[in-house]
């Protein structure tokens, strides 16, 4: 393949030389235009293909470069060789200044900023007549050679830029750009500051456009504002997209399409643009990754390398620590009036595993974000060893010795596995082969045995976790924070993960683990800190935490004052779930779930965080499609129906987190609940207000201004107005004060007595068991126990929440 590439390069070079020196002048001009267009494309390929940012202002930078050369040669008396580098430096400086406000925004907002910049350049070039010649432009721009020679010079610059892009993309800075584009939060967690990285990409793209503009001015000998229309910036973007963003030859191929295709279609007269546009659409449809990407897939069948021999001891020596600890004192943060973390203290010592647990909404991930620099605490102190890292941004925290992983694994999907880990090696410059050897050793340490040159986007879920941990270890951290690393892993992989974490602790790293798998937590933790409603309620070794009544109350709800109801005889089956499996992409969550609900029955679904309760509710309501299994509802199959059709069938979800329409009033929210019905009567709203009297005084208030309890009552009332066959309630007590939760469950008890069919998922076992007829307990994505609600609070329930891993119940 390399021989073919070399032969093609030689042939193209020979053809370019022959065209510029021997062919008619117009063909030399076309080739020069191709080269300058490709040169702009190479720069934009750095910005879009590597850094993932869109600019529609490249025409403005092209104009600045062209006017710079024209003014310096025609008015300042400089020759071309003096004017060209000065013009490029000028464009780079202007782009660096522009990047200060422009790169505070990303995506479409950056595109709009650069569009405005292009219009400013056009306006200045028209109005500043004394310098730019106004609308008439500037003529007599000297060229270093004739048309053919100048075109050949442009081709030379283009060739150097294309080769330079190939090497730049694999450099540390190029990989950092790709990492920032792929997963900016993960990039910050390994010490990469996205702002300067994007700034460099922006300046490089602008400088390349300025260089192309200077060459274009010399090639044409004349420039005017009309030479740089806004449509040209769009064409430059098409050059990269059609050619293949991120591909070395993408800009060259895209430029050939944009420059030569209109010439080929010249005979079509007024239909030329129509056919040209249709052709571009067809190309984008057939090759969404660009022409270069399609060619690469057709011509290359790359065999992934097998695992290289690796020295695990080298990795252990790299991460070995003699000390270092994490100290968190009095950390507090509030969002609006809600205190998410309230004066929490945590100490994680070197060589020990400290786990942070708690029910949903306890503040665990918020605490981790405060410690790792992704959020700023209102008060408190965070220290790594003797270094205070309070309120430092995430990339500085990473450089101070604290690494982290994420709740959903975030490898850099567009990079190879090996490059993911290489980017984690922050402490010291890259060291060539020695750095590659160390990266391989880290992969071996965590247990990754797949190909090192596999794109991370193609990895299985467990391998994505392992690569993320290896990347975090690359910085040889003093403290490693792990946010639910066992989520989605099977029992075997979870046990291997536990052994790995214990090995890392023995190497001297202070590990902080946030995890819902209580079997893992109880088996490997040296100390456990328990949070509830943002407050620390307990701390100690696993045995004491498991027996602590405050911890049990936090998870199971304590002793409820609501008297349990007697189970009733089941009516006809209304909902029948068989062998249901589901997940999120490669992450399995539910495994062969089976349950049923009879008409008029209230059924509870319990289980610890991460057991799959909310995923089950999303499957039942059509929000996610199950992988396998059946959902029977009144004789109809719902498993493949979209959510709106499931709702029309009568399965109504009150989602987790309330999710009212915040800008609509309470009354408008209620009316929307009945929108699928043709027999809705306004008096039904009065009935709901009688059921939830607190809503009556807030009827014309925006729902977003209600308290949490009022929003939950509104969400339930909205669901009831749909007249559901079954009302699904997902964590209705989440985030509610105890008194408010008790009031809400009192209303659910009344609904049960009225014969409304309810399926309730909730963390507070005591409250929901006091209302339910029957209950299912989920553990590890499977049904761990089921039975009559009044008999369910036994050792099986405790084990599911606090550490035993029961076998599935069929």
Q: Residue ranges of each PLM-predicted region?
A:
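Transmembrane alpha-helices and adjacent helix-loop boundaries
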Residues: 1-310
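Generic detector of short, locally flexible boundary/turn motifs and exposed helical patches
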Residues: 4-5, 13, 21, 26, ...
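A generic short-segment signal for beta-strand/edge and adjacent turn/coil regions
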Residues: 15-16, 29-30, 79-80, 122, ...
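Cytosolic juxtamembrane regulatory segments of multi-pass membrane proteins
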Residues: 308-318
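Glycine-rich phosphate-binding loops of nucleotide-dependent enzymes
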Residues: 322-327, 333-810
């Amino acid at each position: 393949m390399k021989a073919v590439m070399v032969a093609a390069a030689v042939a193209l070079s020979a053809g370019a030389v022959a065209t510029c020196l021997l062919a008619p002048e117009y063909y030399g001009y076309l080739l020069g235009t191709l080269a300058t267009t490709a040169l702009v494309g190479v720069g934009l390929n750095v910005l879009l293909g590597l850094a993932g940012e869109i600019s529609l202002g490249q025409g403005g930078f092209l104009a600045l470069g062209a006017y710079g050369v024209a003014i310096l040669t025609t008015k300042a008396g400089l020759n071309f060789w003096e004017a060209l580098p000065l013009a490029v430096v000028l464009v780079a400086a202007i782009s660096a200044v522009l990047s200060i406000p422009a790169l505070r925004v990303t995506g479409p907002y950056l595109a709009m900023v650069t569009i405005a910049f292009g219009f400013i350049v056009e306006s200045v070039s028209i109005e500043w007549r004394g310098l730019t010649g106004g609308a008439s432009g500037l003529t007599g721009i000297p060229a270093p050679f004739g048309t053919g020679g100048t075109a050949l010079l442009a081709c030379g610059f283009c060739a150097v830029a294309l080769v330079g892009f190939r090497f730049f993309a694999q450099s540390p800075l190029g990989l950092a750009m790709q990492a920032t584009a792929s997963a900016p939060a993960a990039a910050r967690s390994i010490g990469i500051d996205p702002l300067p990285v994007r700034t460099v990409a922006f300046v490089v793209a602008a400088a390349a456009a300025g260089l192309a503009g200077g060459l274009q001015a010399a090639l044409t000998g004349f420039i005017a504002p009309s030479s740089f229309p806004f449509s040209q910036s769009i064409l430059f973007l098409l050059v990269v997209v059609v050619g293949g963003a991120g591909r070395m030859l993408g800009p060259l191929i895209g430029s050939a399409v944009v420059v030569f295709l209109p010439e080929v279609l010249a005979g079509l007269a007024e239909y030329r643009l129509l056919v040209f546009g249709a052709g571009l659409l067809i190309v984008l449809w057939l090759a969404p990754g660009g022409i270069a990407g399609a060619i690469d897939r057709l011509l290359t069948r790359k065999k992934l390398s097998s695992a290289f021999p690796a020295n695990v001891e080298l990795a252990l020596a790299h991460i070995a620590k003699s000390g270092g600890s994490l100290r968190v004192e009095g950390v507090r943060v509030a969002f609006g009036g809600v205190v998410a973390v309230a004066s929490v203290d945590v100490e994680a010592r070197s060589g020990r595993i400290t786990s942070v647990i708690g029910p949903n909404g306890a503040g665990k991930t918020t605490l981790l974000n405060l410690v790792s620099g992704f959020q700023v605490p209102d008060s408190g102190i965070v220290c790594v060893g003797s270094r205070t890292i309070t309120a430092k941004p995430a990339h500085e925290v990473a450089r101070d010795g604290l690494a982290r992983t994420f709740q959903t694994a975030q490898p850099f999907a567009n990079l190879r596995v090996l490059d993911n880990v290489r980017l984690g090696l922050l402490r010291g410059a890259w060291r060539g082969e020695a750095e590659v050897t160390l990266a391989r050793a880290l992969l071996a340490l965590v247990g990754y045995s797949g190909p090192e040159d596999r794109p991370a986007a193609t990895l299985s879920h467990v391998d994505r976790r392992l690569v993320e941990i290896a990347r975090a270890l690359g910085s040889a951290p003093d403290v490693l924070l792990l946010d639910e690393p066992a989520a989605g892993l099977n029992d075997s992989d979870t046990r291997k993960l536990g052994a790995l974490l214990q090995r890392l602790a023995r190497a001297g790293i202070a590990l902080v683990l946030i995890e819902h798998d209580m079997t893992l937590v109880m088996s490997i933790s040296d100390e456990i800190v328990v949070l509830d409603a943002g407050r620390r309620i307990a701390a100690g070794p696993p045995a004491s935490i498991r027996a602590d009544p405050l911890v049990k109350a936090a998870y199971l709800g304590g002793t409820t004052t609501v008297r349990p109801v007697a189970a009733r005889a089941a009516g006809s089956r209304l909902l029948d779930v068989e062998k249901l499996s589901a997940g999120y992409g490669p992450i399995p969550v539910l495994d062969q779930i089976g349950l049923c609900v009879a008409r008029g029955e209230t059924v509870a679904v319990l289980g610890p965080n991460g057991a799959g309760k909310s995923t089950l509710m999303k499957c039942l309501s059509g929000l996610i499609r199950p992988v396998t299994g059946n959902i029977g509802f009144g004789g109809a199959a719902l498993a493949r129906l979209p959510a709106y059709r499931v709702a029309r069938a009568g399965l109504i979800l009150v989602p987790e987190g309330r999710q009212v329409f915040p800008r609509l009033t309470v009354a408008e929210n209620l009316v929307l609940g009945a929108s699928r019905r043709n027999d809705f009567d306004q008096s039904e709203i009065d009935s709901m207000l009688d059921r939830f009297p607190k809503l009556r005084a807030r009827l014309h208030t925006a729902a977003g201004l209600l308290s949490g309890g009022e929003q939950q009552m509104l969400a339930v009332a909205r669901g009831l107005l749909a007249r559901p066959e079954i009302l699904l309630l997902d964590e209705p007590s989440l985030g509610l004060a105890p008194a408010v939760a008790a009031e809400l469950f009192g209303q659910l008890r009344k609904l049960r007595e009225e014969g409304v069919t309810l399926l309730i998922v909730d963390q507070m076992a005591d409250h929901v068991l006091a209302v339910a007829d029957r209950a299912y307990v989920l553990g590890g994505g499977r049904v761990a126990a089921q039975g009559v609600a009044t008999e369910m609070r036994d050792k099986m329930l405790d084990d599911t929440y606090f550490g035993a891993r029961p076998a599935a119940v069929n």
